[in-house]
């Protein structure tokens, strides 16, 4: 029988934290998949860790994301979606294995839906959405003439906190993409 340390080292990290965030306490969730039992690992964070993480996310956002153009962010989101549209992308293959086991959805449905859903995040679709919602996506970068005769610039929140649905995959992706497009950092957790 593996020791706790071996169990943790074999676990799949189902989280992402910025570099420099020190976490020493993890939870392990075991899920039975078509490829055997998989151990999913996520950090256990107390209030002070979450507060520190939120401050760090805002700091990194202010130094990086806030200075990027909306076109650069569009390209990054679209490139990520393109990776996820590829059935050979390792993280997608992992998702296709884990999502049915966690949600009870049929594997074929998950595979088809991942491909279909990722199409919404192509550059053309994202730009079309921004155009329909705010008119001038460049107003996220700089002051631009507005309809009233003055100048306006759209400013998104520095940080959003999102609780992700645990049983309906994909829903958080839209919120995360939109938050990134308005140059906001994201602190999220699964429900």
What is each model feature region?
Residues 126-191:
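Conserved small-residue-rich beta-alpha loop and adjacent elements
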Residues 1-150:
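N-terminal Rossmann-like NAD(P)+-binding subdomain of aldehyde/semialdehyde dehydrogenases
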């Amino acid at each position: 029988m593996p020791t706790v340390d071996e169990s943790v080292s074999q676990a799949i990290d189902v989280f992402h934290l910025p570099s420099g965030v020190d976490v020493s306490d993890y939870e392990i969730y075991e899920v039975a998949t078509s490829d055997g039992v998989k151990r999913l690992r996520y950090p256990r964070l107390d209030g002070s860790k979450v507060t520190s993480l939120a401050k760090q996310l805002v700091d990194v956002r202010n130094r990086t994301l806030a200075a990027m153009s909306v076109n650069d962010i569009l390209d990054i989101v679209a490139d990520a979606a393109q990776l996820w549209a590829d059935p050979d992308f390792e993280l997608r293959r992992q998702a296709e294995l884990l999502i049915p086991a966690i949600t009870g959805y049929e594997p074929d449905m998950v595979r088809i839906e991942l491909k279909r859903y990722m199409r919404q995040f192509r550059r053309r679709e994202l730009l079309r959405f921004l155009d329909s919602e705010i008119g001038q996506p460049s107003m996220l970068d700089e002051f631009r003439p507005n309809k009233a005769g003055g100048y306006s610039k759209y400013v998104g929140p520095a940080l959003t906190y999102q609780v992700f649905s645990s049983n309906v995959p994909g829903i958080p992706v839209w919120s995360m993409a939109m938050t990134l497009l308005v140059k906001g950092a994201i602190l999220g957790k699964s429900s």
